[in-house]
Amino acid sequence: MSKETYLHLVTLLKPAIHQRNTKFRECVSAEERILITLRYLGSGCTFVSLGLYFARGDNTICKVIAEMTVIIWEILNGDYMPLPDVQHWKDIAARFDRLWNLPNCLGACDGKHIRIEKLPDSGSSNFNYKSYHSIVLMACCDSDRLLFTVIETGYAGRNSDGGIFSASRIKRWIEHGRLNIPLPSKLPNDQSNYEFPY
């Protein structure tokens, strides 16, 4: 990441970070909080190694990352991952049809295991078939640029992609019409008058 990009992130996120120094301790600055979080998200380092690198306690690192990921999502979500509108979905479907001959396809969905340290008192709930502890990121992306259109994360690694999708908000959003999905339409080169859902 360039210095300019980092400074731009600081400018965007700093107003939402509310920390004060006290008589007993100096708070972790907004700049350092952002650095800790970026290092964690970019490398997957353990809290212990981040604590050593930044000379902070493991619990402090854990708390900073938990707070900062929420702030990053709340501040940047609307600009960098807005909910697609009907026309955006139709553009994605047109690219799927043109590139892959898949008409009315709005995305490719899959789960990705994100390696984590074993959580305290979690037993084997995050232990996956690849023989490590993980949480699962369920995501849908467009046809060619591999840009996420919908994401959800936090499911225990032992769950299958199908099980996660069945229990996910993504599935509920689709079923309840909250994703601005276009109305059914005819398939290209189809002689019937049937309309098929996206």
Region spans (language model):
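A structural signal for short hydrophobic/aromatic patches embedded in well-ordered alpha helices
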Residues: 8-9, 36, 92
